[in-house]
Amino acid sequence: MDPSLLRDRELFKKRALSTPVVEKRAVPSESPSSSSSKKKKAKVEHGGSSGSKQNSDHNNGSFNLKALSGSSGYKFGVLAKIVNYMKTRHQRGDTHPLTLEEILDETQHLDIGLKQKQWLMTEALVNNPKIEVVDGKYAFKPKYNLKDKKALLRLLDNHDQRGLGGILLEDIEEGLPNSQKAVKALGDQILFVSRPDKKKILFFNDKSCQFSVDEEFQKLWRSVTVDSMDEEKIEEYLKRQGISSMQESGPKKVASIQRRKKPASQKKRRFKTHNEHLAGVLKDYSDITPGK
C-alpha cells in the first residue's frame, strides 16, 4: 500500500480517538414487581385518607352506636345507657317505673330493631341486678332504697346496733335521691371515715357512747397485746363473743397467684467402672510370685 495512504489512515484514527463521544443511557423498563408496589402505595395512601376521614368524623361527634347495630357491642351499649339513665333519674327523685317504650324514647333509642327490643325485655333488663320489674315496667334497684334523711339515719343506726359498721358513701348516693343535701342536713349525727383507697364510709354517731374513761383503764386497755395471735384466731374469738368483723366495708384484697415450684431434678450419681466389659476375661495373678 502507498505509504502516504497509511499516514493518512493513522492520522484519521488519532483524530477519531481524540474526539469526545456522548452516549445515551438506555431507559430501564419497569418490572411488574415495581409497578405493583406503586399501586399498593397508592392504595395505602387512599386508605389512610379514608381512615383519617373516619377519625375526624368520630372526633366531630358524628360517630354513634347505630354504626354497630349488627354487633353485640351495640346491644350492650344500649343496655349500659339505659341502666345509667335509670340510675340518674332515680338520684334526681324520679323513682316511678317506666315502660320499655318510655325508656327507649327518653334515651333516644326508638329506632332499635325488634330483636334488640325482645332481648331487652326477656333477658337484659330482667336479669340485670340494678333493674327491677314492677307490673311490666322497669325501675332502678339500688343497694339501699332510701327515701329521705330519716331513712338514712335509721339505716346507719341499725348497722351500728348490729355491729355491721358503716356504709359506703357511693352506695348511699346511689339509693338516696338528692343525697348530698340529706347528708349535709344530718350534720354531726353521722361520721365520715376515709379508707386507704380514698373511698368514704358513713357511720352512725352514737352520742350515748361519748363518755370519759379513767386513765388507768386506758393504760390497761393499751397494755393488752395481740401480736401473738393471728387474724383468724382474733376473728374466731370475736364470733364467740357475738361480734362480727366489718369485712364488707374494707377494700377487697386481690388474692396473689401462687406459682408452683418446680421439683428439683435429682440426678443419679454415676460410679466409674474399670474394664466392666472384660469381667469374664480378666484373671487375678496377684498370688503368683515372680520367677527369679
UniProtKB/Swiss-Prot annotation:
<feature type="DNA-binding region" description="TFIIE beta">
    <location>
        <begin position="67"/>
        <end position="147"/>
    </location>
</feature>
<protein>
    <recommendedName>
        <fullName>General transcription factor IIE subunit 2</fullName>
    </recommendedName>
</protein>
<dbReference type="GO" id="GO:0005829">
    <property type="term" value="C:cytosol"/>
</dbReference>
<keyword id="KW-0539">Nucleus</keyword>
<dbReference type="Pfam" id="PF18121">
    <property type="entry name" value="TFA2_Winged_2"/>
</dbReference>
<dbReference type="GO" id="GO:0006367">
    <property type="term" value="P:transcription initiation at RNA polymerase II promoter"/>
</dbReference>
<keyword id="KW-0007">Acetylation</keyword>
<dbReference type="InterPro" id="IPR036390">
    <property type="entry name" value="WH_DNA-bd_sf"/>
</dbReference>
<dbReference type="GO" id="GO:0016251">
    <property type="term" value="F:RNA polymerase II general transcription initiation factor activity"/>
</dbReference>
<dbReference type="InterPro" id="IPR016656">
    <property type="entry name" value="TFIIE-bsu"/>
</dbReference>
<dbReference type="GO" id="GO:0005673">
    <property type="term" value="C:transcription factor TFIIE complex"/>
</dbReference>
<feature type="compositionally biased region" description="Basic residues">
    <location>
        <begin position="258"/>
        <end position="272"/>
    </location>
</feature>
<comment type="function">
    <text>Recruits TFIIH to the initiation complex and stimulates the RNA polymerase II C-terminal domain kinase and DNA-dependent ATPase activities of TFIIH. Both TFIIH and TFIIE are required for promoter clearance by RNA polymerase.</text>
</comment>
<dbReference type="GO" id="GO:0003677">
    <property type="term" value="F:DNA binding"/>
</dbReference>
<feature type="region of interest" description="Disordered">
    <location>
        <begin position="245"/>
        <end position="277"/>
    </location>
</feature>
<keyword id="KW-0805">Transcription regulation</keyword>
<dbReference type="Pfam" id="PF02186">
    <property type="entry name" value="TFIIE_beta"/>
</dbReference>
<feature type="region of interest" description="Disordered">
    <location>
        <begin position="17"/>
        <end position="64"/>
    </location>
</feature>
<keyword id="KW-0597">Phosphoprotein</keyword>
<keyword id="KW-0238">DNA-binding</keyword>
<dbReference type="InterPro" id="IPR040501">
    <property type="entry name" value="TFA2_Winged_2"/>
</dbReference>
<comment type="similarity">
    <text>Belongs to the TFIIE beta subunit family.</text>
</comment>
<comment type="subunit">
    <text>Tetramer of two alpha and two beta chains. Interacts with FACT subunit SUPT16H. Interacts with ATF7IP. Interacts with SND1. Part of TBP-based Pol II pre-initiation complex (PIC), in which Pol II core assembles with general transcription factors and other specific initiation factors including GTF2E1, GTF2E2, GTF2F1, GTF2F2, TCEA1, ERCC2, ERCC3, GTF2H2, GTF2H3, GTF2H4, GTF2H5, GTF2A1, GTF2A2, GTF2B and TBP; this large multi-subunit PIC complex mediates DNA unwinding and targets Pol II core to the transcription start site where the first phosphodiester bond forms.</text>
</comment>
<dbReference type="InterPro" id="IPR036388">
    <property type="entry name" value="WH-like_DNA-bd_sf"/>
</dbReference>
<feature type="modified residue" description="N6-acetyllysine">
    <location>
        <position position="75"/>
    </location>
</feature>
<dbReference type="GO" id="GO:0005669">
    <property type="term" value="C:transcription factor TFIID complex"/>
</dbReference>
<keyword id="KW-0804">Transcription</keyword>
<feature type="modified residue" description="N-acetylmethionine">
    <location>
        <position position="1"/>
    </location>
</feature>
<dbReference type="InterPro" id="IPR003166">
    <property type="entry name" value="TFIIE_bsu_DNA-bd"/>
</dbReference>
<feature type="compositionally biased region" description="Polar residues">
    <location>
        <begin position="51"/>
        <end position="63"/>
    </location>
</feature>
<feature type="modified residue" description="Phosphoserine">
    <location>
        <position position="62"/>
    </location>
</feature>
